[in-house]
């Protein structure tokens, strides 16, 4: 078997990231009303699965295997390739039929293969003890998050698609991926690269905060003081834990300082989300939810992946990307203001902002895909 290079492994998240971004742009264009009889839900499922599994999960898995093991072995590589086949089928399947037999089947197969792959990763891990603990905690969260998808089948069989539990099954999965396994894996890679070491207490605090922050998702379906208190405690712990790392990042490269600033900002926003006024605002406004998810994905994870890609990205591309991401966030949070300011329908404004984002993603990903070395 040929030597498996990092470039070869990276080709899949780069390609799926590009395709997922294009699908998202088509979706944004369709929201302007320019495409008749457009299957919004089908395409949305395709976009979200490709970006979550095809870009983010793939990229983090590649980074973990290349940074914390002696390299990906043959069996793990074959499992990785099997995951790519699943993502490709999901990309097409969701567009054609939405959630149906084929997409449910291959979503499940992807999940089962990912179990096998992360177990192999666990067995081959090497490196500084605290970062290994973060990675293993992330793997545990990966297993925990899958309770959400497994609950969807029984809920559908019971015709409970409109119940709050169906929505919470989805939120449970997303939270323990975005703010569970992915978050901890990102921190492990970040701390290894910056040679920042955490104490056992700091790790426990961070993991505890991420568990408690699921309460913010529960707020979408239930209104109880205990949920508010749990979310507040989780946000408070995370903010304190991040603030204690502030001095360690002051001596790092600018790109890591900015990334840490983004982490801290997201921690503070979690704190604001614990205040009833702001939490109720987000719960009642779908644009706010989209803004939050895009902030995590486009504002934190994508820049992190680009930094770790070891690909030279021009300052103009970085500035352009930051401008368009921030523009899209402000438009989502203050839609009426910007619609009146520019006298343009809000969906067209969002399309223009996302066009800029997709252009930047295309430049970075296609350049990395076709570079010779």
Model-inferred region functions:
Residues 1-373:
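Hydrophobic alpha-helical transmembrane segments of multi-pass integral membrane proteins
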């Amino acid at each position: 078997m040929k030597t498996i290079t990092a470039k070869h492994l990276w080709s899949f998240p780069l390609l799926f990231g590009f395709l997922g971004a294009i699908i998202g742009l088509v979706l944004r264009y369709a929201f302007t009303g320019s495409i008749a009889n457009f299957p919004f839900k089908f395409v949305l499922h395709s976009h979200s699965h490709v970006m979550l599994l095809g870009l983010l999960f793939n990229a983090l898995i590649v980074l973990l295997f290349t940074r914390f093991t002696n390299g990906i072995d043959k069996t793990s590589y074959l499992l990785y390739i099997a995951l790519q086949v699943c993502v490709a089928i999901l990309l097409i399947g969701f567009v054609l039929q939405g959630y149906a037999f084929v997409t449910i089947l291959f979503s499940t197969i992807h999940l089962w293969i990912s179990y096998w792959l992360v177990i192999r990763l666990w067995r081959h891990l090497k490196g500084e003890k605290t970062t290994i603990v973060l990675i293993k905690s992330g793997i545990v969260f990966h297993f925990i998050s899958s309770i959400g998808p497994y609950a969807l089948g029984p809920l559908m069989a019971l015709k409970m698609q409109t119940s709050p539990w169906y929505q919470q099954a989805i939120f449970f999965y997303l939270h323990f991926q975005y703010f569970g396994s992915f978050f901890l894996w990102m921190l492990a890679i970040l701390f290894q690269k910056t040679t920042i070491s955490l104490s056992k207490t700091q790790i426990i605090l961070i993991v505890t905060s991420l568990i408690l922050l699921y309460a913010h998702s529960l707020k979408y379906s239930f209104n109880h003081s205990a949920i508010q208190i749990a979310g507040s405690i989780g946000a408070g712990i995370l903010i304190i834990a991040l603030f204690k790392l502030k001095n360690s990042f002051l001596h790092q490269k600018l790109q890591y300082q900015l990334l840490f600033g983004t982490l801290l900002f997201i921690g503070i926003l979690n704190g604001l989300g614990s205040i009833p006024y702001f939490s109720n605002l987000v719960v009642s406004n779908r644009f706010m939810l989209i803004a939050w998810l895009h902030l995590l994905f486009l504002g934190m994870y994508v820049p992190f992946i680009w930094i770790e890609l070891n690909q030279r990205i021009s300052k103009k591309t970085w500035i352009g990307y930051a401008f368009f991401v921030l523009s899209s966030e402000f438009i989502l949070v203050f839609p009426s203001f910007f619609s009146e300011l520019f006298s343009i329908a809000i969906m067209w404004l969002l399309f223009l902002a996302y066009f800029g984002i997709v252009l930047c993603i295309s430049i970075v990903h296609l350049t990395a895909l076709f570079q010779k070395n």
